[in-house]
Structure formats: C-alpha cells, structure tokens
Regions:
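Bacterial N-terminal signal peptides
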Residues: 13-22
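Helix-centric, low-specificity signal for extended rod-like, repetitive segments
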Residues: 1-2, 232
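Bacterial N-terminal signal peptides that target proteins for export
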Residues: 2-14
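A Zn2+-metalloprotease active-site environment signal
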Residues: 25-240
C-alpha cells in the first residue's frame, strides 16, 4: 500500500515545480489551487486502491459487518434456494468473483451488492419472486460486483472535499477507518448511476441467458417491482 506521506512528498514536489511557471503576482493563489487539485486527485487514487484491496481481501469481515447491520434470516429453505441459484449462475463460467449471498429480514423488494462481494437479498424479494426472477436479480447484483460499482459509490458518498481533508492531515490510518465505516454504512444509501444500473442489467442478462432459467424472468422481475412501487422503486438509492 502506498503511504500517504509519499503522496504528500510527491505532490509537494509537483506544486513547487508549477510555481516556477507561474507569474509572481498569481503564484500564491495559483499554487494553492493547484495543490488542492493535485491532493484531491491523488487521494482519490489512493482511496480507490484501498477500497479495491478491501473488495478483494476483506470479504469475511465485510460479510460479518453487513450481516450485523441488516440482520440474517436463519431459514434453511431460503439459504438453500440462494445457494442453488448461485451455483447455477457460477456454472456458466461467466462469474469471475466469489460472492457471499444471504437473506436479510427486510420485507421490502430489494437486494444489494457491497464491498467484499457481499450480496444480500431481502426476505420480501425472496417471498415475491420465483426462481427465474430471483436468478436474474442475482445476475444483476453480481454484475455490480464484477464491475466494482460499489467502490465508485463509496467514493461518491464520501466526497472529494473530505478526502482532501484526510490527505492533508497526513494520517493513512484515518483514511482506512473512514473507508471502512463508509463501506459498511453505504448499504443504507447507495450511490448507483443509471448507467451502472443499465450495465448491470445488460451484462447480467448475458449471464442469465446462458442458464436453464426462463429468460422471461428478467422482464417479469422488473415489472413486478415496478407494479409494487411505481417510480418509487428507486427509493433508497441515489441515482446520478
């Protein structure tokens, strides 16, 4: 992992070199602006690297933290159903990551994927959808994981100004703590772009059509949720 101090040293060198090209009258303000922009860009890169490491290596911890936050449905029938569908999707050879999938007790029609390849499906969705529809839902959520959408969502939820403040503080441990906390709480208010949703639908369907499930389950699952919530089906997500 690249230490924050190395980033600061690198940026200070760049800002100093920039000052040689700036007229004296504008040097102070321009250097300050350049420094902020450079620190912001570098911190975004560093934060993304750390989140990628969490996404790849912290699955057990993220699973435990997420389950503690959402609760878990201890129902063998639900667990077996999810495991069976997941196994069928993985058998296509088109799923590259490992996912931990579990049911939570919420009665809302929803499911989510978060840092660590953790996927949670609400009890309400398990009760409402048949296996074809649920399989497409899991295809969709797995594609969020394959494309690392949660990483970008966490970065957006923190904001560039907060990352710059942490960077200028020079304490890498603070950034670790911040990212860990936001990653766990991210499930309460996901930042998912409409382009990411469309991508998850399209690439998810590419997986889905290579299974034995009825491809009509893709359309019927989305139609069912729309009929229940109308335009409010997006509630709980920040769409950009």
């Amino acid at each position: 992992m690249i230490e924050m101090k190395l980033w600061k040293k690198w940026l200070t060198t760049i800002v100093a070199s920039l000052s040689l090209c700036i007229a004296p009258a504008a040097m102070a303000s321009a250097a300050s602006t350049a420094q902020i922009l450079l620190y912001g860009a570098a911190t975004m890169v560093l934060a993304k690297q750390q989140l990628l490491q969490m996404d790849n290596n912290n699955q057990k911890q993220m699973l435990a933290n997420t389950q503690a936050k959402t609760g878990v449905v201890n129902n063998e029938a639900y667990s077996d159903r999810l495991e069976n569908i997941q196994r069928n999707l993985v058998a296509t050879g088109l799923i590259k990551r490992n996912y931990d999938v579990y049911a939570n007790p919420s009665t809302d029609l929803n499911a989510f994927e978060t840092i660590g390849g953790v996927i949670s499906v609400n009890k309400g969705m398990l009760d409402a959808l048949n296996d074809d529809e649920l399989a497409f839902t899991l295809c969709h959520e797995m594609q969020h994981g394959e494309k690392r959408h949660a990483i970008n969502g966490v970065l957006k939820s923190i904001g560039i100004s907060t990352l710059v403040d942490v960077s200028l503080g020079g304490n890498a441990d603070v950034l670790d703590i911040l990212l860990g906390s936001v990653a766990v709480n991210y499930i309460d208010n996901e930042f998912v772009t409409m382009d990411q949703e469309k991508q998850a639908d399209a690439t998810g369907f590419n997986v889905f059509k290579n299974t034995a499930y009825n491809v009509g389950g893709a359309a019927s699952s989305m139609q069912y949720v729309y009929e229940q919530y109308g335009e409010l089906w997006q509630e709980g997500f920040k769409r950009i």
